[in-house]
A protein has these predicted regions:
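Glycine-rich hexapeptide-repeat left-handed beta-helix
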Residues: 3-5, 12-151
Length: 151
């Protein structure tokens, strides 16, 4: 720990945390690298081989393993799958990624900043290799799409 604050009940296991704040009951590590400027909320997780820089992580959000989250805001109760990267640098400028609350991101994703993923978002169709997903079509809202037991 270097110039870091760790709140009560938080656990930091075999990790480097520098210039960051770790919220109550957060779980960090093992082998997490937190560069300066991170703010992790309560009951968050930054797991094995996760690197973070200037990330703001909402309460209950999990980044369990093998991910880079830099210059990003993640909402509350969001889950980031392994191998997810927020690509924040275009060779000249740093850009920001925002991922909302209650978002479930699968494994192996690349978010090329600047980009925003809204609350509760899901990509529901296959995406071919070497493709980019974006939408300029009419948005369809499916209210109550989660099963009752999951709400």
């Amino acid at each position: 720990l270097i110039d870091a604050t760790v709140d009560a009940e938080a656990v930091v296991e075999r990790s480097r945390v520098q210039g960051s704040h770790i919220g109550r009951a957060a779980n960090i590590g093992p082998w997490t690298y937190m560069r300066p400027g991170n703010e992790l909320g309560e009951e968050t997780k930054a797991g094995a081989f996760v690197e973070m820089k200037k990330a703001h992580i909402g309460n209950g959000t999990k980044v369990p393993h093998l991910s880079y989250v830099g210059d990003a805001d993640l909402g509350e109760h969001t889950n980031i799958g392994g191998g997810t990267i927020t690509a924040n640098y275009d060779g000249v400028h740093k850009h920001h990624t925002t991922i909302g609350s209650n978002v479930h991101v699968g494994a192996g994703n690349l978010f090329v900043a600047p980009v925003t993923v809204g609350d509760g978002s899901v990509v529901r169709h296959d995406v071919p290799s070497d493709s980019m997903v974006y939408s300029e079509n009419t948005q369809h809202v499916v209210e109550g799409w989660k099963p009752e037991w999951e709400r």
